Regions:
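Short, flexible helix-adjacent loops and helix caps
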Residues: 7, 67-71, 95-98
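Short glycine/serine/threonine-biased micro-segments
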Residues: 7-11, 45-48, 85, 90, ...
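A generic structural signal for secondary-structure junctions
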Residues: 20-24, 70, 114
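Generic hydrophobic alpha-helical scaffold/packing signal
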Residues: 16, 40, 44, 53, ...
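Long extracytoplasmic/lumenal interhelical loops at the membrane interface
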Residues: 3-4, 8-46
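Transmembrane alpha-helices of multi-pass inner-membrane enzymes
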Residues: 80-93, 97-123
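Hydrophobic transmembrane alpha-helices and their immediate junctions
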Residues: 46-86
Length: 123
């Protein structure tokens, strides 16, 4: 899929529909709802530019959380955000966890909470 559609991907939620055309003839599953790998799923559905942007997002989030870990009075939240990124990346090699809205919401809260907690302009 990625080789045939490197720039745009096959489109959101199209992997299941097109999987049969690309699957290995010896694959156990004839139908697959997703590719069980976050980077592969993003590249297949949305293309390599989207994968690059996703990678940049994670790199910036990780870098900023690392800075928070050293400077924030809520270091434990920054550590939790970094752990969330590490856990998502590890699990994401074997499951498309970004396709699960509950997971995605918790992940985004975990990586943004350290920044919200350090705001001083709140009443």
């Amino acid at each position: 899929m990625i080789e045939d559609h490197p720039v745009t991907g096959v489109g959101p939620n199209m992997v299941q529909r097109l999987y049969a055309q690309y699957r290995d003839p010896e694959a156990v599953e004839k139908v697959n709802p997703h590719l069980h790998n976050v980077p592969m799923q993003i590249a297949a559905e949305r293309g390599l530019p989207a994968l690059a942007i996703w990678t940049l997002f994670l790199a910036v989030a990780g870098t900023d959380l690392w800075k928070k870990l050293k400077t924030s009075r809520h270091r434990f939240l920054a550590a939790g955000g970094l752990a969330a990124i590490a856990g998502m990346l590890a699990a994401g090699l074997f499951e498309y966890n970004f396709g699960d809205s509950e997971f995605l919401m918790l992940f985004l809260v975990m990586i943004t909470l350290p920044f919200a907690a350090d705001r001083t302009d709140l009443p």
